[in-house]
């Protein structure tokens, strides 16, 4: 299990989308926006937006809508993006290297401090000035560098064992890209990300119409 939340996960998962939308509005010099206009941009009902934001105090003004900069700044604080977090990556393969090279995370306050792998041929490799190290050194590194978040990009066979080591070393949050749902203590924050899920959703939607045509054409046989 992962750490319990006060606000529902459905609401929490919409917050980054609101934040991203507001960031684009600011870039386009839009100062205020109504919940109706925001809903059209987001594909979420205006009522849902108001309900979501009311979990944190509301922020809107009747007849005015939302002050874009004020709401953006409030969501930045709510999402904890006004703080910085020390992160490590476990697994320096293609996915691990891609995440390490994604500079947007650093701009959002997620500072990459170390990369670890089991492959000796990768030891010493530098990705954006961060050196790949032996995973056997990870516990000591966590203790000495106050690491907040571990990003797991390794095969599923070693994922749970590695997660157990990370938790024991004091990691309080794991972003898991390994193709397995990890189990962690209740006080550890866990996000399991299965990249194939989104692709499978697309494949379903591509075949949905054909599927239901077949279902409508089938007859139900009753024994007896």
Curated annotation (Swiss-Prot):
Subcellular location: Cytoplasm
Molecular function as annotated in GO: DNA binding; DNA-binding transcription factor activity
Keyword Repressor recorded: yes
Stored Pfam families: CoA_binding, Put_DNA-bind_N
DNA-binding feature ranges: 17-56
Binding site for NAD(+): 91-96
Keyword Hydrolase: no
InterPro entries according to UniProt: CoA-bd, NAD(P)-bd_dom_sf, Rex_DNA-bd_C_dom, Tscrpt_rep_Rex, WH-like_DNA-bd_sf, WH_DNA-bd_sf
Keywords: Cytoplasm, DNA-binding, NAD, Repressor, Transcription, Transcription regulation
BP GO annotations: negative regulation of DNA-templated transcription; response to redox state
Function: Modulates transcription in response to changes in cellular NADH/NAD(+) redox state.
Entry similarity comment: Belongs to the transcriptional regulatory Rex family.
Record text on subunit structure and interactions: Homodimer.
Descriptive protein name: Redox-sensing transcriptional repressor Rex
């Amino acid at each position: 299990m992962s750490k319990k939340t006060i606000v529902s996960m459905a609401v929490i998962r919409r917050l980054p989308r609101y934040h991203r939308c507001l960031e684009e509005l600011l870039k386009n010099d839009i100062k205020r926006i109504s919940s109706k206009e925001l809903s059209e941009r987001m594909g979420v009902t205006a009522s849902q937006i108001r309900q979501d934001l009311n979990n944190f105090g509301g922020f809107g003004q009747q007849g005015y809508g939302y002050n874009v900069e004020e709401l953006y700044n409030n969501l930045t604080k709510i999402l904890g993006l006004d703080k910085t977090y020390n992160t490590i990556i476990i697994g320096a393969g293609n996915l691990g290297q891609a995440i390490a090279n994604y500079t947007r995370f650093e701009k959002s306050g997620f500072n990459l401090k170390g990369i670890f792998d089991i492959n000796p041929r990768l030891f010493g490799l530098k990705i954006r000035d961060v050196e790949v190290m032996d995973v056997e050194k990870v516990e000591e590194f966590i203790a000495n560098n106050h690491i907040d978040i571990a990003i797991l990009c390794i095969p599923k066979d070693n994922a749970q064992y590695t997660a157990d080591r990370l938790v024991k070393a004091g990691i309080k949050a794991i972003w898991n890209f390994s193709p397995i749902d990890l189990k962690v203590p209740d006080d550890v924050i866990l996000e399991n990300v299965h990249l194939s899920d989104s692709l499978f959703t697309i494949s379903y939607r591509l075949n949905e119409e054909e599927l239901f045509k077949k279902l409508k054409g089938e007859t139900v046989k009753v024994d007896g």
